[in-house]
Amino acid sequence: MRRALIAGNWKLNGTTQAATALATAVRDGVAANKPDCDVLVCPTFTVLSAVQGVVAGSGVDLGAQNMAVASSGAFTGEISGEMLKDVGCSYVILGHSERRTLFGETNEQVAQKVASAYRDGLTPILCVGETLEQREAEQTMQVLEQQLLACLPVLPADAAKQQQLVVAYEPVWAIGTGKVASTAQAQEAHAFIRGLLAKELGANVADAVRILYGGSMKPDNAKELLGQADVDGGLIGGAALKANDFLAIMDGLTA
């Protein structure tokens, strides 16, 4: 049985004061509500250490939003997985649609980062998803397949480590556009991803990998989305910046 994961991607938001206040509210809410899921917050790099000071030992895990391929060296502006581990991170988001579209990250670069995350002892949250143009051209499954197949060959050979992979499906066309992906569309994409994982890695791995929904999950749609057979949690953006909304999404797992 896959344990749900509710992950908050704080993106480019939060001074130290604001981030620690949000982390405190999330930590205290999780302690009070005891949601039936794993909980993760992914702040911006500059506040990782401060947020870790708030959530350490609380059951709320810490993650980063990106990482470098290299471990060290002359790579100005980059942050390595070893550095992320050093401040308490256990997860890292890779291949987010904003990294792909705004910063030109390719499938090959994302694959290199996935390999580096495993090397450095971090659990990768691999983001995949199609644009509006690709969906309207009925290329959704083709895009998902290309993005996944670029990364699966770099996974460790050990099935137990393969099972640790987290995949996040981001229908890019449904993020901040006013368009909404139906639960049926979400489930269809998640089922396709799991089927591809089964084909490439085997059923045991596919059945264990958690697939998160990253298409503007909010308190008012979380319960229905989280009720789908292949939706194992959410990668939450805007709603993660308000503790009450973030905690309310977790209620969708038990309500």
Curated annotation (Swiss-Prot):
It is found in: Cytoplasm. HAMAP family: TIM_B. Homodimer. It catalyses: D-glyceraldehyde 3-phosphate = dihydroxyacetone phosphate. The keyword Cytoplasm applies. Involved in the gluconeogenesis. Catalyzes stereospecifically the conversion of dihydroxyacetone phosphate (DHAP) to D-glyceraldehyde-3-phosphate (G3P). Substrate binds at N9, W10, K11, G176, S216, G237, G238. Belongs to the triosephosphate isomerase family. It comes from Magnetococcus marinus (strain ATCC BAA-1437 / JCM 17883 / MC-1). Keywords: Cytoplasm, Gluconeogenesis, Glycolysis, Isomerase. Pathway: Carbohydrate biosynthesis; gluconeogenesis; Carbohydrate degradation; glycolysis; D-glyceraldehyde 3-phosphate from glycerone phosphate: step 1/1. GO terms for biological process: gluconeogenesis; glyceraldehyde-3-phosphate biosynthetic process; glycerol catabolic process; glycolytic process. It holds the Pfam family TIM. It comes from the Bacteria. One of its GO terms (molecular function) is triose-phosphate isomerase activity. Its EC number is 5.3.1.1. GO terms for cellular component: cytosol. The active site is at H96, E170. This is Triosephosphate isomerase.
